[in-house]
Regions:
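Glycine-rich beta->alpha junctions and the first turn(s) of the following alpha-helix
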Residues: 181-278
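DPxDG-like acidic metal-binding loop motif
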Residues: 127-171
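Glycine-rich phosphate/cofactor-binding loops in nucleotide/flavin-utilizing enzymes
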Residues: 334-381
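N-terminal glycine-rich anion-binding loops that anchor highly charged ligand groups
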Residues: 25-41
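A structural signal for short hydrophobic beta-strand segments in well-ordered beta-sheet cores
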Residues: 113-117
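Internal helix-loop-helix
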Residues: 36-102
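C-terminal helix-coil-helix/basic helical segment that borders enzyme active sites and/or dimer interfaces
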Residues: 14, 18-21, 280-316, 326-337
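Generic structural signal for well-ordered, non-transmembrane alpha-helical segments
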Residues: 236, 272-279, 311, 315-322, ...
């Protein structure tokens, strides 16, 4: 059971799915209601007024929200995982950014920005794509490569020095570039900043910054959490499709014969297979997160094997969800092609999620190398 009281909010989100998609962003009043419910504070330390939930609880909540409305679930995931950086900031900076109980956060990990050291900070410019939920955010963040003397700065291990720079949302320009066929309501357009000064205290290194707050959550890998968040939204979306199909099948009579769809053998088989696939994928996620959580609670750095399992489970769940969505969409026949059908929207949403770099097919190779015991660059595990 969710530690948050979400049922009235979930009903509201479900009833306004058409509005969310038409707006191509999460309406401001809904974003405020979601903030009030605590959805954006799940991964913020308790010492900063956050919830600091166990990873699996946050993921289950993301599923619940996505089952109500996928775009709202996606925005929940992005804001929560963006706020995860709070566990790596000094306490004063953390309170400045994450102390507001109504704060909304967003960001893009991809290092599309450029950060040049200046005084006790960085002069930052950049433009980032996929800035989901940015129109409602109070703080935004973006990945940036550090340059010194015109050259990219390297870490001792030879990797580029990449930082997540955090800045007030008012300093960013938002660009209306989000014209997609799925996840339409996420407002995932571009954002940019030009020549802003970001204090060093608001520039987190994903490669070398150590947690500044206690707890197993902050020993989890950043990319593992992000990929699992995507998987949670995908699973919630696809599970909701099962209910949509069951509702339709009770009365739909396919051409040929008098039986409703629910009485057709092929529909029963397809529904059973989709259900089994989704429950199995969900179980793999739960198993992988549980194993990693046990290691993190022991105070250890997560093993490469545990980190690989997180990425593998996330990619498998996201792609399995899209396959199940295809099955359910097909079973609905011609009814699924109309815009009034929730099945067509969820089908589109499912397939947009598979395109995220954290769950793309390259993950199979990365985790397969670990399974074979081959030397593997574990940076993105």
């Amino acid at each position: 059971m969710s530690p948050l009281k979400l049922e009235p909010l979930l009903q509201t989100l479900a009833s306004r799915s058409d509005d969310i998609e038409a707006a191509r962003r999460l309406p401001a009043d809904l974003a405020q209601e979601m903030a009030k419910a605590g959805l954006f504070r799940m991964m913020i330390p308790k010492t900063l007024g956050g919830l600091q939930l166990p990873a699996i609880e946050s993921l289950k909540i993301m599923q619940e929200v996505a089952a109500a409305d996928t775009s709202a679930g996606w925005c929940t995931m992005i804001s929560a995982t963006s706020a995860y950086k709070s566990g790596f900031l000094d306490h004063d900076t953390g309170r400045e950014i994450y102390g507001d109980p109504m704060g909304i956060y967003g960001g893009i990990f991809a290092p599309m920005g450029r950060a040049v050291p200046e005084g006790d900070g960085y002069r930052v410019s950049g433009r980032w794509s996929w800035a989901s939920g940015s129109a409602n955010c109070t703080w935004l963040s973006g990945g940036a490569m550090v340059f010194e003397g015109g050259e990219m700065r390297k870490l001792p291990n030879g990797a580029p020095d990449s930082r997540m720079v955090i800045f007030p949302a008012a300093q960013a320009e938002l660009h209306d570039t989000w014209h997609s066929h799925g996840l339409k309501g996420t407002g995932s357009g571009d954002m940019s900043v030009t020549d802003i000064l970001v204090p060093a205290s608001r520039a987190v290194s994903l490669m070398k910054s150590a947690p500044t707050h206690e707890g197993a959550l902050y020993r989890f890998p950043t990319f593992g959490l992000l990929s699992l968040g995507i998987a949670a939204v995908a699973l919630g979306n696809a599970k909701a499709m099962i209910g949509d199909l069951v509702d339709l099948a009770a009365s739909k009579k396919p051409t040929g014969g008098g039986k409703v769809l629910a009485q057709r053998g092929y529909a029963q088989t397809g529904l059973a297979q989709a259900t089994a696939a989704l429950r199995s994928a969900d179980a793999f996620v739960t198993e992988a997160v549980g194993r990693a959580w046990d290691e993190a609670e022991a105070g250890d750095d997560l093993s490469v094997a545990a980190r690989a399992d997180l990425r593998l489970a996330a990619t498998h769940a996201t792609r399995t969800s899209a396959e199940a969505a295809r099955t359910l969409y097909d079973l609905a026949g011609g009814d699924s092609v109309f815009l009034k059908s929730p099945l067509q929207r969820r089908f589109r949403d499912a397939h947009v999620m598979t395109q995220h770099m954290m769950v793309n097919p390259a993950t199979w190779e990365l985790t397969g190398r670990v399974a074979f015991g081959l030397p593997t660059d574990a940076t993105f595990l």
